[in-house]
């Protein structure tokens, strides 16, 4: 009798242990994971779509639920927030120089971060275009038209916005080529352009709002994706996209933030999240949101959406961001010298 009771007790204990293990395993499978993607201004719609698809894929693959929170603003401003303590698991910023600043000032990821993913950790590209009102009433076709008297130009502040820095360099590069490499003439051209800028918003999306919704300005210097999105949201009967004679290859990079990921226990999923951007599914979402995909098959599918034009590059034409950032946008740099509000 005693033996049977002992066996029964062991059996019950085994059942309870198995149940607890099963429950524990189930709890692991149903983990609630949260990531923070600190991004630049005009990527809201892109990452809303990316996050939803990645979460579905991750759930199917692992059983875990993942929520990706988004933070958006001017790229330089966002980099400063991370440096000052905003706990980003990943950063998806407007230019490599802003992630380099996080390396240099906060030491949150290694200096060779750009080598960890394909295409220098830039899963998509973009360029800079001109958005005008329907019918192009001011006859704006190229950079020269932006310096004409009476033209009101909307562009954000290159001190805080990554897009604004691409805008500035595209205009500078145009003027430099037109004037045979004469930097004094390029500076005079860009100075004249900024004299036509009534207000510098802190980020690209703010400038788009100023132009599109507040109806300020004759022309918006814009990310291609934001210009295309404006046509989609507000109608081709409201605006037109103008491709200038030359622009710049904008390469927005991505990186996981190692020291934050270690603290959060999110290293593996942060890496997987950014790798998803390179998959055919991720590239499809990228193209659908008017960014230029790297995948050749996806790029061919959307070729009509992305006109070809001559493009300057940050490395070949400006010596890379480590040279361009202090020269043009550092304290006392070219922008500080040519931009005189109210003058």
Locate each region found by the language model:
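Bacterial N-terminal signal peptides
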Residues: 9-24
